[in-house]
Amino acid sequence: MNPYGNYNQTFEYLSSLANIRQDASITGAKNPKHYLQRAKLLLKLAGNPEKFAKKIIVVTGTSGKGTTCNILHQILSQAGKKVGTYFSPHPTTAIERIKVNELYISPNEFVQTVEKAKPIIEKCYQQLDAPSYFENFLLIALLYFKQKKCDYIIIEVGCGGRYDAANALSRIDLAAITNIGKDHLHIIGPTQKDIAYEKAGIIHKNICFTTERKKQLLKIFQNETKKTKSNLIKVNFKNNPNQELAATIAKHLKIKDQYIEKGIQTAKLPCHFEIVQKKPLIILDSAHNPDKLKYLTKKLKNSSIEGRLCFPEGKLHIIFALSAPKDIKACLKPLLDNFNAQVYATRFLIEQRNSTDPRKISSIIKKHWPKVKCQTFLDPWQAFYKAKQNLKSSQTLIITGSTYLCGELRKHWISEEQILKSRKSFN
């Protein structure tokens, strides 16, 4: 008997809600205000469960949202605060989205909270429209944080900011914008200025922290702060912008340096340059846009494990999948311009997002990097087995391009059942 049968059924129910064609969704809304209106209604019908919290912190940006949220979560937790964080998306299993202090929501609590949410979701559907996948998960997280009496709530924005469900919260006390890069161009683009405008939408009558440096983009943030009579704090950094951003927010919250240092030291996320095997070296990294893949390339070149460079002389094996639509060439360019690579193009398995056809990835590689060997696989596990078969002990395998791909193949080392049982992503 499957001990997590009810949990699996509950997750299937939430996933199935995506098969109702909605009047507005962030991926194709002609009237995005309707999308935000629906999210606001959903939370209002729930009694705005977030309003009990002492501080509500919302983090957006092209890259580093999850890392910043996680570091800040760890800092506050080390300082003895009751903190609940909502991450999006999850790598392997749904409970990884909802965390209070050191533990994810338990499978049983997840089932119970979804049961509480069902009549609220139904009311929203009857009064206006069926809530989106992201909205429903956000609602479940907020209901759980209320039950756990969290002092601090941290929310990772799904996409953009202005019309994201996170902006439907009854208030945002602190906002953070990591940076502006090129991702989700078909939704919030096509230019970086467009993207900056959308992300600036989380600035209300609050303080906004940012590590963005481009003057033309900072001007957009400053215009928003003038409109909302809020403050913009530019965070300077040398090496790690996400650490510095989280630390600056923590200092603003009057958290002592000792807790900030310990929080930074203990913060880690699955599929973020995660070394799952040392010989041969296998790394999971969920980089899924050009900026993140540039950073991954830099890290591969400069990092070492037990005195050995992550990328020694020889071949880099890459298992690669990508959400659609994305700029395949721009995403592959950092890796394929810098390494002697062999690519295993595949797809991810979740149904809520479109995966790029592996043949499209292969055709781009053949056109722009004709010397790079590329094989295509519909089954990511077949791609994994083939890569492992070809991998020599002195070589490196990187699994990248998608959180969903990394989270699926991560099961080879840490099973979904282990995560559900321990309520942690790491052993």
Language-model region placement:
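Short, flexible loop segments at boundaries between secondary-structure elements
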Residues: I350, L420-N427
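N-terminal phosphate/diphosphate-binding loop that engages ATP/GTP or pyrophosphate donors
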Residues: N70-A117
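Active-site-proximal loop/hinge segments that shape catalytic or ion-binding/gating pockets
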Residues: S402
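Residue-level recognition of phosphate/Mg2+-coordinating polar/acidic sites
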Residues: G66
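Short functional linear segments
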Residues: M1-G61, N70, Q74-A79, Y125-L128
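Nucleotide phosphate-binding/pyrophosphate-handling subdomain across enzymes
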Residues: K55, Y152-V157, Y163-A176, I180-H184, ...
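C-terminal helical cap/extension that packs against the catalytic core
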Residues: R213-V235, N239-N240, K251, L281-I282, ...
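Flexible active-site lid/hinge loop adjacent to a nucleotide/diphosphate
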Residues: Y133-E212
